[in-house]
């Protein structure tokens, strides 16, 4: 029997060769910062590559959101991952959230993002790191970094242009426009709604 790692802020299950990672900080709308979700995602990616019983990894969110991305309260208060000067924040970013795309790109099985609600900012980028995205009718997608006066630094700009082309990715990044699941399917961001 395969031992599934115990995670802090996410749930990991394995059934019929399908590993399901559920981001479980619905009180924070599954924000990646201000929680242990970054470590949980990286731990899961490493475990999947060592487990012969996994054929696919599904990532989803608990509650009403897939992931709100960064913790806006911490950003506003310049606390948590966003405390300190620019150099300190940049260092925490590299040692924190930027570990996610590095870990997921090395996963040797297909990754499916089951987007159950809003995927905003780094949450949208997390969905874009998957090989396939399936969205519920409640899903919304937004590359909203510019609305906060920041740029996507967790791989989102690179992943999105691979999915939908440079021009459309540039438009979504520069406008911060939030799109619904239907438009996301029309653009080729999601496979099915």
Report each predicted region and the residues it spans.
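Conserved CoA-thioester-binding segment of acyl-CoA-metabolizing enzymes
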Residues: 1-62, 102
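Phosphate-coordinating loops and pocket residues in cytosolic domains that bind phosphorylated ligands
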Residues: 31-34, 68, 77, 147, ...
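Crotonase-fold acyl-CoA enzyme core
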Residues: 102-193
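Conserved beta-strand positions that form and line the central face of beta-propeller blades
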Residues: 11, 28-31, 65, 74, ...
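Glycine- (often His-adjacent) and acidic-residue-rich active-site loop
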Residues: 28, 61-103, 119, 149
């Amino acid at each position: 029997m395969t031992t599934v790692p115990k995670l802090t802020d996410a749930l990991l299950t394995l059934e019929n060769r399908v590993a399901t990672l559920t981001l479980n900080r619905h009180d924070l709308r599954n924000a990646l910062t201000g929680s242990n979700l970054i470590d949980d995602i990286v731990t899961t990616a490493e475990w999947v590559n060592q487990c012969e019983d996994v054929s696919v990894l599904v990532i989803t969110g608990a509650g009403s959101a897939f992931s709100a991305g960064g913790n806006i309260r911490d950003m506003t208060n310049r606390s948590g991952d966003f405390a300190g000067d620019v150099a300190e924040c940049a260092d925490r970013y590299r040692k924190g959230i930027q570990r996610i795309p590095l870990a997921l790109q090395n996963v040797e099985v297909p990754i499916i993002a089951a987007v159950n609600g809003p995927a905003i900012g780094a949450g949208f980028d997390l969905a874009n790191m998957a090989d396939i995205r399936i969205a519920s009718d409640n899903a919304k997608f937004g590359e909203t970094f510019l609305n906060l006066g920041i740029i996507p630094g967790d791989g989102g700009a690179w992943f999105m242009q691979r999915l939908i082309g440079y021009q459309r990715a540039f438009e979504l990044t520069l406008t911060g426009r939030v799109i619904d699941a239907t438009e996301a399917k029309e653009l080729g961001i999601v496979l099915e709604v």
